[in-house]
Amino acid sequence: MLPRRGCAIIGNVTSSIAAEFRRYKSLGEAAIAQVNEADLAKVAGEDNSIAVIVWHIGGNLRSRFTDFLTADGEKPWRNRDEEFEARVVTREELLAKWESGWQALFGALASLTDADLDRNVTIRGRPLAVSDALLRSLAHTSYHVGQIVYLAKEGAGGGWTSLSIPKGQSAAFNQNPQGQKPGEHVARLERK
C-alpha cells in the first residue's frame, strides 16, 4: 500500500503515477525514434527485438487497463505468447499497437481518484489492490522501456543522442537541473 498520513493519502498519487507513466512512454518513443525501421525487428540470439518488446507493452497495457476496475486484467482476447513471436512490422503498425496500450492506460488513470487506490481489481483471477496493480504495471513497463533504450542505444552506435544526462556532463547538469520532475523530463525529451 501507499504511504498514508492518518486516513489521507499523501499527495495526489494517481497524478504522480500518470506522470511517471508519461515519462516512460516518452523515453521509449525517443529511443524508438533513433532506430531505423529495419532494425526494430533485429535480434541477437534468443533476445527479444524492440518490435517484440513494444508489441508486448502495447498488449499488456491494453489488457490490464481496458475496463480496469470491472474486468480481469488478463483479458480472454489477449494472446500473450503471440506478443513474443518475432515480427517484422512497419514503424506505423508498431506505434499503433504501442499507442493502443497507452490510451487504455491513460483512459483508466484519468477516471481514477486516490480513493480508488484502496479498491481491488482482479488480475489472472487474483484480487490485487489498485495501488499495487498500478505500481506493478509501472515497474513492468519501466523494465521493458529500459530494454528498448538499451537495444536502441546499442543499435545506434555513435549516432545515439542521450535521453538523460550525457556522460561527463553531470556537473553541468547539477548547476542547472532540468527534467527532475516527470513532466519536465517529458517536455525535454519532446524537444529533442
Residue map of PLM features:
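Basic polycationic patches enriched in arginine
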Residues: R4-R5
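N-terminal leader segment of winged-helix/HTH proteins
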Residues: T14-S15
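Short, contiguous alpha-helical
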Residues: A18-R22, S26-I32, E37-E83, I123-K192
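Helix-adjacent hinge/juxtasegments
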Residues: D67, D72-A108
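A short N-terminal helical cap/helix-turn-helix that marks the beginning
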Residues: A110-T113
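Active-site-proximal loop and beta-strand segments within enzyme catalytic domains
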Residues: R119
